[in-house]
Structure formats: structure tokens, C-alpha cells
UniProtKB/Swiss-Prot annotation:
Changing residue 344 to A: Decreases LAMP-1 redistribution. No effect on peripheral accumulation of GFP-PipB2. InterPro entries: 5peptide_repeat, PipB2_N. Transmembrane segments: none annotated. NCBIfam families: PRK15196.1. SUPFAM superfamilies: Pentapeptide repeat-like (SSF141571). This is Secreted effector protein PipB2. Contains various tandem pentapeptide repeats in the C-terminal region. The pentapeptide motif is required to efficiently recruit kinesin-1. No position is completely conserved in these repeats, whose consensus sequence is A-[DN]-[FLM]-X-X. The C-terminal 38 amino acid residues, specifically, the C-terminal motif LFNEF, are required for peripheral localization of PipB2 and redistribution of lysosomal-associated membrane protein (LAMP). The N-terminal 225 amino acid residues are sufficient for type III translocation and association with Sifs and SCVs, but not accumulation in peripheral vesicles. The gene is pipB2.
Length: 350
């Protein structure tokens, strides 16, 4: 019995103290020699049983929080009780009048027997908020609650049209997620993973995507005005028809990105890399591309009036039917073909 209580207490600590994939694997692995033997001869039966119990613990916690809190932003209750978890009572006692330890105390009891553990309050609250986020947006609970970096695990989530204004999505995993038409105005997505996500038509104005991964993402028609994309990875992203007015893309990796039809007026793309990028019928008036790597990029029918390409790498860059009035190219590196084009057609603007 005590070993069962110990196991459940360990699961509770792993689920609500860490919530990561590694924590889940550790909590559901066989613990004793006998369990290892049984697990082997049942082709993982012990692990499957433990994983089922782990998932039930998470789902019960989510439902309990949802039923006891008026909304996701409300303070957590000082005492959270989960009854009948495999015949046991699981109680979470938060710091307060009855708990001066500063940690969340987990008590698992059955009859006269009990086991206790302690969980850092900050981790516990972050995990509870992640469970409530999933409840609010009708997402099924996942046994992996957080990423290794401490962000929410929302991999493959369907959040079409969701209102995520000012949401904290730092270090979250939204790879493969569908956020078409969602509103992420002023959202903090620093370090988040949006690889392969659908962000078509999303409102991302004034949002923070610093060092975020947007590789292979679809962002057609999205609004990114005044967004912070410094150091972000946008390789192979589709930004067709995006509005990126005064967007900060300095140092971003935009290799092979498609920016056709995008509006990049006064966008800061200094130090960005756009090798092999396709930029057709875009508006880039006053854009800053100093020190940018534009090798083999293709500019077709694009308005670059007043753009700054000083010190940029323009080797084998294609400029066709573009507006290049008042263009700055001081100390830019150019291939012979690019230099010839400028000399022949736009010498008055160099």
C-alpha cells in the first residue's frame, strides 16, 4: 500500500512540479525489480498502467480547477482536493495561513497511511494555468504539459479564431498548430516554436516573436505591424500579402521566405539574411536592409523607394522592374551583373 501511495505522490510531484516529457517518463517508469520483470513480460503493461493513472491525475486536476475557479486568471485556491484517485485522496496545500513552508505541499492519503511531497509554487502555478488554458479553448489535456524550457505544450493545437491578446506564450511549443484568424495582438511569444504552424490571417501586431521559430509556417495575410521578430527563424515561411509596417526583423533568418505582396514600409531588416527569398510586388519604402544578406534573393516589381541597402550582400541578387529611387547602396557587395544593372538603369540613385 505504502509503495502505491509513494508512487502516486511521485506522479503528482512530477506532473505538477515539472510537467515535462522527461518528468512524465520518469514518473511512469517501473520502479522496482518486480515491476521491471512484470513490465517486460507484459510488453510494457506496468508503464501503460502508470501512464493511464498519470493522465487521469492530470484530467482530474484540470476539471477540479475549472469547477472551483471563476476564470483562468483568478487566484488559485489555497487547497485543491482530488478525491478517489485509485482509491486515494490527493490534496495540494498552497502557501498561506495553513502552510508557511513557501512550497506547495502534496499529501496522498488512504486510510491511516499518507505520503507527502513538496512542489515549487511557481512551477505548480504555471502548470495549473496551462491546464486551464486547455480547458478554456477546449483542447484535450496532454500528459506533457510544459516544454523543457517551461512554456506551454500546445503542439498541433487547434486555436482557429482564438483571442490570445496579450497572452504569455514564451517558450511554448505550437509547432503544427492551427491559429488561422487568431488574435495575438501584443502577445509575448519569445522563444516559442511555431514551426509548420498555420498563422494565416492572424493579428500579430505589436507582438513579441524574438528568437521564435516560424520555420515553414504559413502566415498569408497576417498582420505583423510593429511586431518584434529580432533573431527569429522564418526560413521557408510564407508571408504572402502580410502587413509588416515598421516590423523589427533585425537579425532574423528569412532564407527562402516568400514575401510577395507584403507591405514592409520602414521595416527594420538590418543584419537579416534573406538568401533565395522571393519578393514580388512588395512595398518596401524606407525599409532598412543594412548589412542584410540578400544573395540570390529575387525582387520583382517591388517598391524599394528610399530603402537602405548599405553594406548589404547583393551578390547574384535579382532586381526586375523595381522602383529604386533614393536607394542607398554604400559599401554594398554586388556581383558584376547586379552592378551593371544599377549602372545602366539606376545610376542616378546610387
Amino acid at each position: 500500500m505504502e509503495r502505491s501511495l509513494d508512487s502516486l505522490a511521485g506522479m503528482a510531484k512530477s506532473a505538477f512540479g515539472a510537467g515535462t516529457s522527461a518528468a512524465m517518463r520518469q514518473a511512469t517508469s517501473p520502479k522496482t525489480i518486480l515491476e521491471y520483470i512484470i513490465n517486460f513480460f507484459t510488453c510494457g503493461g506496468i508503464r501503460r498502467r502508470n501512464e493511464t493513472q498519470y493522465q487521469e491525475l492530470i484530467e482530474t486536476m484540470a476539471e477540479t480547477l475549472k469547477s472551483t475557479m471563476p476564470d483562468r486568471g483568478a487566484p488559485l485556491p489555497e487547497n485543491i482536493i482530488l478525491d478517489d484517485m485509485d482509491g486515494c485522496r490527493v490534496e495540494f496545500n498552497l502557501p498561506g495561513e495553513n502552510n508557511e513552508a513557501g512550497q506547495v505541499i502534496v499529501r496522498v492519503s488512504k486510510g491511516d497511511h499518507s505520503e507527502t511531497r513538496e512542489i515549487p509554487l511557481a512551477s505548480f502555478e504555471k502548470i495549473c494555468r496551462a491546464l486551464l488554458f486547455r480547458c478554456e479553448f477546449s483542447l484535450p489535456q496532454d500528459s506533457v504539459i510544459l516544454t523543457a524550457q517551461g512554456g506551454m505544450n500546445l503542439k498541433g493545437a487547434v486555436l482557429t479564431g482564438a483571442n490570445l491578446t496579450s497572452e504569455n506564450l514564451c517558450d511554448a511549443d505550437l509547432s503544427g498548430a492551427n491559429l488561422e484568424g487568431a488574435v495575438l495582438f501584443m502577445a509575448d511569444c519569445e522563444g516559442a516554436n511555431f514551426k509548420g504552424a498555420n498563422l494565416s490571417g492572424t493579428s500579430l501586431g505589436d507582438s513579441n516573436f524574438k528568437n521564435a521559430c516560424l520555420e515553414d509556417s504559413i502566415m498569408c495575410g497576417a498582420t505583423l505591424d510593429h511586431a518584434n521578430l529580432t533573431g527569429a527563424n522564418l526560413q521557408h515561411a510564407s508571408l504572402l500579402g502580410c502587413s509588416m509596417i515598421e516590423c523589427n526583423c533585425s537579425g532574423a533568418n528569412m532564407d527562402h521566405t516568400n514575401l510577395s505582396g507584403a507591405t514592409l514600409i520602414r521595416a527594420d531588416m538590418s543584419g537579416a539574411t534573406l538568401q533565395g527569398a522571393t519578393i514580388m510586388a512588395a512595398i518596401m519604402e524606407g525599409a532598412v536592409l543594412t548589412r542584410a544578406n540578400l544573395r540570390k534573393a529575387s525582387f520583382i516589381s517591388t517598391n524599394l523607394d528610399g530603402a537602405d541597402l548599405a553594406e548589404a550582400n547583393l551578390n547574384n541578387t535579382c532586381f526586375k522592374d523595381c522602383t529604386l529611387t533614393d536607394l542607398r547602396t554604400e559599401d554594398a557587395t554586388m556581383s558584376t551583373s547586379t552592378q551593371t544593372l544599377f549602372n545602366e538603369f539606376y545610376s542616378e540613385n546610387i
